Each structure stands twice: as structure tokens, then as C-alpha cells.
């Protein structure tokens, strides 16, 4: 699956997102300089915390509009980003869920 979308920060930029079953490849293209930047590799991982975060209403709503959702798991926090709308540091509009040690939701938020 390949998507090419306008870059959300650069009016002369485009973002290419290649989705395979177990990873994403992403690269930005800038019309002012021509050529692609280096491709970024994002493995799609599954684990109990990621799956538990999907119970969150906020995450379910986020996943409804996100075309390229990607989850980052750090300790007991799962952060979902849409790869169309992010920087190289995966900073953007996010849905975050904090889980306890039993994978029960204790806090959730959506925003920047």
C-alpha cells in the first residue's frame, strides 16, 4: 500500500508512506530541491500494552481518522501518531494512553 500526501508543514513538500504488513517506510520529497530524503523505517509491533490501548475511546476515535497509525510503547504508555502528520521525531497530534501493570487504562489524552 503506497500513499503520497502533501506534507503538512512544507507547502512544497510531499510525503510518501509505504505500508507493508510488518513495517512502514516513509520519505519526504521537497519540490524546491528535488529528490527524496532518506527513507525512515518504522516496524509495526504488537504487544499486550498496544492491544490494551485499543480499548480507549480516544484511541478508537483516533484510529478511525488516521490513515497511517503508528504506536510507540514506552514503559506503561502507548502513544499513537498518524505518520502523515508527524515530524522525523514522531511529534505531532497524538492519542496517548497510560496503563497500569495489569494493562488497565488509568489515563488517556488526545492532542499535541
Give residue ranges: language-model regions:
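C-terminal regulatory/interaction regions
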Residues: 1-112
Amino acid at each position: 500500500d503506497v500513499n503520497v500526501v502533501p506534507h503538512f508543514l512544507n507547502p512544497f513538500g510531499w510525503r510518501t508512506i509505504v505500508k507493508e504488513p510488518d513495517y512502514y517506510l516513509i520519505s519526504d520529497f521537497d519540490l524546491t530541491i528535488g529528490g527524496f530524503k532518506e527513507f525512515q523505517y518504522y516496524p509495526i509491533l504488537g504487544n499486550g500494552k498496544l492491544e490494551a490501548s485499543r480499548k480507549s475511546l480516544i484511541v478508537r476515535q483516533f484510529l478511525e481518522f488516521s490513515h497511517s497509525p503508528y504506536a510507540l510503547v514506552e514503559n506503561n504508555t502507548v502513544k499513537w501518531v498518524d505518520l502523515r502528520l508527524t515530524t522525523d521525531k514522531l511529534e505531532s497530534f497524538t492519542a496517548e494512553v497510560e496503563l497500569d501493570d495489569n494493562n488497565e487504562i488509568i489515563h488517556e489524552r488526545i492532542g499535541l
